[in-house]
Regions:
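Conserved beta-propeller blade signature
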Residues: 91-93, 138-140, 187-188, 228-230, ...
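Beta-rich, blade/repeat-based domains predominating
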Residues: 75-87, 121-135, 167-183, 211-224, ...
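A short beta-strand motif characteristic of beta-propeller blades
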Residues: 69-74, 112-122, 160-162, 204-211, ...
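Blade-level signature of beta-propeller repeat domains, shared across WD40, Kelch, NHL, RCC1
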Residues: 369-397
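A short helix->beta-strand "capping" segment at the edge of beta-propeller domains
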Residues: 54-78, 206
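Short loop/turn segments that connect beta-strands within beta-propeller blades
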Residues: 107-111, 153-157, 200, 243-247, ...
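Short loop/turn segments immediately following the C-termini of beta-strands
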Residues: 97-98, 144, 192, 234-235, ...
Length: 397
């Protein structure tokens, strides 16, 4: 057989093989199409028989979990410890433990808009820590030196103080003066001096005796979606929940106090050692960053203990959990101060699942040195207190 015939036969065989592969490919495609039609038909028939939401065939892209990315930093703060954002995200509030121990207000570009502080106190008499902003824009700040939760308007003008589980400063004054507190009266309380200062319109400042209060030392504050205020208390190592109705501006003078409290001192499952922040997930469960126990504990809406997590080894293990924030996807973000990182858990199911961490020890962009608090706005921007680097880092999803 000549070489030309051999070449011709080889080419014919190759063409036949290509045709066979093409035929098989078309057949496989038809089978897949038929299978897809059968699946769609089955789902359609099932829906006709029993109408209900159909299962999702393709995962939605915004349900995929991935770490945020670093955006920028806000400077001009001295040893910051707490951060919060206004409801419209236009203002960032930061508490300082260094310098003058102020609460500073920044815009989103990091420009300083103003500052305020615990009224009637010197530097050594105040120590603002955690901050929470109500839906109406009022700012709630815990002060460790004053053993109180101070309430301000959005511009930092003082309104009132929560002095205990069932007492506000305005309630105390109302009782002390027989309900005859004139409109326009200003007042404040200095716990270190044990004096209430009162100035009525047209009169000079008066000093009144301090209220007789049970010891309490509020630390962490967070609002849930219904406007209830969750407070961690170091005195008895507990979490206390104040109903939204008692916190309205017109209700503070008749403050009715907390509706629920749980927790005690210790290292057992249902106990706390320096609880920092309590937040609520979409199922109403409360998650508490239990600082010195190195874990987060989960409780039901009635204050019954469920479980704890964040212990052990690996990336999911917490060292010193401080501030925490629950986003709309039920992702709990925990500032691990000693771990110099933010750890994130999916708490949408019965048991929390560790997702990822971000950040590490350092002083350059995206690195932390003792992160102490975190909050997230409605646009998915994360504001993280980077205490020893004297800045607020801003990240974004």
């Amino acid at each position: 057989m000549s070489s030309e015939n051999q070449t011709f036969e080889s080419a014919s065989e190759m063409d036949a093989e290509k045709e066979e592969r093409r035929r098989r490919g078309l057949l496989l495609l038809l089978l897949l199409l038929l299978l897809l039609i059968c699946c769609v038909g089955f789902l359609f028939v099932r829906y006709l028989i029993k109408p209900q939401p159909l299962p999702e065939l393709v995962p939605v892209i915004n349900q995929v979990n991935y770490p945020p990315t670093y955006a920028y930093s806000i400077y001009g703060v001295d040893k910051p410890v707490g951060v919060a954002v206004s409801p419209d995200s236009s203002r960032i509030y930061v508490s300082e433990t260094g310098g003058e121990r102020l609460i500073k207000i920044f815009n989103r570009d990091g420009q300083l808009l103003g500052s305020f502080t615990t009224p009637g106190t010197s530097i050594g008499e105040r120590s603002p820590v955690y901050i929470a902003v109500a839906a109406d824009g009022r700012v709630f700040v815990t002060d460790r030196m004053q053993d109180a939760i101070l309430i301000y308007d959005a511009d930092g003008n003082y309104i009132d103080s929560i002095l205990g589980p069932e007492m506000t400063l305005s309630k105390y004054l109302n009782k002390h003066m027989g309900g005859l507190v004139p409109e326009g009266t200003t007042f404040y309380y200095n716990n270190m001096k044990g004096v209430v200062y009162l100035t009525q319109p047209g009169e000079i400042e008066q000093a009144l005796p301090a209220p007789d209060l049970a010891e309490w030392d509020p630390l962490g504050v967070r609002f849930d979606k219904d406007g209830n205020l969750l407070v961690t208390v170091v005195t008895d190592q507990s979490v206390r929940i104040f109903p939204a109705g008692t916190l309205r501006s017109d209700s503070l003078v008749a403050f009715s106090g907390q509706a629920n409290a749980f927790g005690s001192y210790g290292q057992e499952a249902e106990q706390f050692l320096f609880p920092n922040v309590a937040v609520v997930d979409s199922q109403g469960r409360v998650h508490v960053s239990d600082g010195n126990n190195g874990r987060v504990s989960m409780w039901d809406a009635q204050g019954k203990f469920i479980l704890y997590y964040g212990r052990g080894t690996g990336d999911e293990a917490l060292n010193l959990p401080r501030g925490a924030w629950m986003d709309e996807k039920n992702r709990l973000h925990v500032a691990d101060a000693v771990g110099h990182t933010i750890r994130v858990y999916d708490v949408s199911g019965d048991e929390p699942v560790f997702l990822y961490k971000f950040g590490d020890l350092g002083d350059t962009d995206g690195l932390f040195y003792y992160p102490n608090d975190i909050c997230i706005d409605n646009a998915g921007y994360l504001f993280i207190v980077d205490r020893e680097n004297n800045r607020i880092q801003v990240w974004t999803y």
